[in-house]
Amino acid sequence: MKFLPSLEEVKKIAHEQIYNVLPVSTEMLSDFTTPIEVMRVLKNVSSHCFMLESAQADEKWGRYTFIGFEPKMEITCIDGILNLGDITVNTNQPSKYLRQILANYKSPRFDYLPSFTGGLVGYFSYDYITYSEPSAKRETENNEAFKDVDLMLFDKVIAFDSVKQKIILMANIHLENYEVEYNRAVNELKQLAELLHNGEKIKEKSGKLLGDVKPYFNKEQYCEMVEKAKNYIREGDIFQIVLSNRLSANFEGSLFNTYRVLRTLNPSPYMFYFSGTDVEVAGASPETLVKLENGVLRTFPLAGTRPRGKTEEEDKLLEKELLADEKELAEHNMLVDLGRNDLGRISKFGTVEVEKLHSIERYSHVMHIGSTVRGIIREDKDALDAIEAVLPAGTLSGAPKIRACQLIGELENNKRGIYGGAIGYIDFTGNMDTCIAIRIAYKKNGKVFVRSGAGIVADSVPEKEFEECLNKAKSCLKALEIAQEVD
């Protein structure tokens, strides 16, 4: 096996004293297994794991699948109580401690490696806004004790390269004692290669729904909530607000098979499976929250929807109709402005621009109007600042954002948790890629939850908005149903 970089190259980087970690890597052919099979092997070793995949708008599978297991630590925060492995701290600034952790893991980028080589993986919940904007906080019911943050630190990563048909194994080393660390990483990677070839796969029961799926708000309650929101809109408090409803059912077993089904039912730019201490998440989200790559910030507002046509001709007619819909365009433009304002808070003056406006993005079942907003991050800001500036997305809150969040707390009166938050990674090079936590199923305390929302404006019809929430939940509910029969 060949290992990169060489020990001589590591020595040189260590002596420069710019970085304190770097990834040692090796490669193997991938023709003997699949990412799903590898996950089954790793889940037998560690219940704490993740899988990140991608499918493009034309349903072509993305190049890389990232897998991690055996995290160095799990970091959670709920209502200002931060757990860093075995340490507990009271804080109203979780990002301060996350920054301290990441400061111990500053890595160079290597052109021969994929975009993610190790870092923090997990989620920032919708309610994380209360740390950066305390005025948005409202006392809401949280019987399920949903965390505000749940991240795991992975210094070992497996990447499947679907183009070159190979697996890249990566283990990060600390440069302080680089020779000992290098030898440790080489041995670790050899053992990992052996595990992938010969490891035993987990024998897991398919997840089972126990009883009916029930909404948090029945139709009458949800419609009443919509009418209250429309009053706030008429009074000029807000222009738009996104009101959500939560579906839940008792559940036993794992969500891994649900993820396997969901990725085939709903191929999406962001597909993820995440298993922590007390939560499991399976999702397929179409929408980026915020991305930071080599100092460039991007957010991709996505709003305005039509179903996909049965033929290319019908697709083009629906595209034309969507781009001529003034109401859809007005709503989309409001979100583009919100994206510019959000990035403007952390970007260098004069660098925020709309890179792409009103393009049609096609997905497996629907098409959306998409735009791209770009900015250059300021030297004194980082990925954590970007998350605080953008979370939650306007498509999951409303406009103006802070007032919409305050009213969501009052009207919904139950903690959203993961839904509407950010799922993804912050890596050891300072880059970040996060999606909006929608089209997800998550399991906690013997229950499974699926949540979805509808954008409320002045002329919204409450009954239609209730139905829209149910329609948006369909792909996850269908995946839960089908997964019960999957081996």
Predicted regions located by residue number:
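Extended alpha-helical targeting/anchoring segments
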Residues: 1-487
